[in-house]
Curated annotation (Swiss-Prot):
Protein family membership: Belongs to the MIP/aquaporin (TC 1.A.8) family. PIP (TC 1.A.8.11) subfamily.
Pfam family, one: MIP
InterPro entries: Aquaporin-like, Aquaporin_transptr, MIP, MIP_CS
Locus of motif NPA 2: 233-235
Signal peptide: none
Cell compartment(s), UniProt: Cell membrane
Domain of life: Eukaryota
General function of this protein: Aquaporins facilitate the transport of water and small neutral solutes across cell membranes.
TM region(s), chain numbering: 43-63, 80-100, 131-151, 173-193, 207-227, 255-275
Any one GO MF annotation of this record: water channel activity
Keyword Signal: no
Protein name: Aquaporin PIP2-3
Amino acid sequence: MAKQDIEASGPEAGEFSAKDYTDPPPAPLIDADELTKWSLYRAVIAEFIATLLFLYITVATVIGYKHQTDAAASGPDAACGGVGILGIAWAFGGMIFILVYCTAGISGGHINPAVTFGLFLARKVSLVRALLYIIAQCLGAICGVGLVKGFQSAYYVRYGGGANELSDGYSKGTGLAAEIIGTFVLVYTVFSATDPKRSARDSHVPVLAPLPIGFAVFMVHLATIPITGTGINPARSLGAAVIYNKDKAWDDQWIFWVGPLIGAAIAAAYHQYVLRASATKLGSYRSNA
């Protein structure tokens, strides 16, 4: 027997082929018992507050940036001031990092209907929980933007209210594609960063998971702010549209729902049926897909 054959039949081969990991069971489609548990309502409250804080900080950053760079308000050197697109991207990505870290152990730290939808399709959450999360996220977003308008009433409408709108020069198809791809990047990162198989092998992964998720949001914003202002989060887009309440924001609103939901669905399918399926063939873990 060749030396490499002996090595392949040793402990390392056993570690490779052994089913040292078992997926958690899929969440039930409808779990009525959840409605009797305080943990569900605590998680819903956490999603509401997290989305409120997310929209308050990020939209306030956008309004502040536009005010600082308004030549009429800040003088001829306005273009050199403000946080710039890079700073706005950091505000969105940084807040996601902070809020996911704070709420991951309570609600899973979704803060985004597209993320919730993707996890629902992958049977990570029940339909009941998914619906309550999405409602809480949308209400939290509306309240968060409402706070911005209340605190910055002099500038809110003048500088666009932080609403997502398709930029001039881009077609609706381009905007939709940008939202699909951007949300795919985010939800794919969520699945990869929170993969229980990876967590089982590396104990530090759950602690670090918010970092790549926040960084994904940051990178997507750099790419898509010039196109759509970056939605990738239907609650974020809806909250700003409700408070800003201008025709352009409402006319483009469908892009910021259809695009993210399609992107989330593609990411869920890719993770469940391509990446996990290949792992199953190698025998490294059992798939419930």
